[in-house]
């Protein structure tokens, strides 16, 4: 559980906290994430990536006629990709929280959570297939950074 790991370490952290999920590979520019965080005035910044449909999206009218089709489009939603910046000022809230989702929802409700939009490469590794795909594509991620 993420929140437990953070709580176990937080008393040893003297500065702000940068948190990265361990099951994600990305070509996110960390310097730009930090710069966005500093300029935004938010106490917490999460990185987000556009949600891409796994399916073709079909628009249908009342008569059942297809009026539009897009194969695996980017949707108008963003997903958390697990790169966070927490100001030290929120450490007490972290200590008091019982779940990471609850904590992030609380920061959102307080208006202190910002979103850094990353539209580059993002690979999540939650399955054996995703791991295999990541292993095949990892070199292309680092070639693009150069």
Regions found by a protein language model. Name each.
Residues 1-60, 93:
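Conserved beta-loop-beta/alpha segment of the NTase-like Rossmann-fold superfamily
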Residues 17-18, 25, 34-38, 50-53, ...:
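Catalytic-core segments of class I nucleotidyltransferases/pyrophosphorylases
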């Amino acid at each position: 559980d993420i929140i437990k790991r953070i709580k176990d370490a937080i008393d040893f952290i003297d500065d702000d906290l940068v948190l990265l999920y361990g099951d994600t590979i990305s070509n996110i520019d960390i310097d730009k994430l930090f710069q966005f965080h500093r300029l935004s005035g938010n106490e917490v910044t999460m990185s987000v990536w556009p949600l891409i449909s796994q399916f073709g999206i079909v628009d249908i009218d009342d008569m059942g006629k297809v009026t539009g089709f897009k194969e695996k489009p980017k949707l108008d939603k963003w997903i958390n990709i697990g790169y966070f910046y927490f100001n030290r000022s929120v450490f007490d809230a972290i200590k008091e929280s019982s779940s990471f989702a609850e904590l992030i929802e609380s920061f959102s409700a307080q208006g202190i959570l910002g979103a850094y939009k990353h539209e580059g490469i993002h690979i999540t590794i939650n399955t054996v297939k995703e791991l295999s795909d990541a292993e095949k594509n990892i070199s292309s991620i680092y070639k693009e950074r150069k």
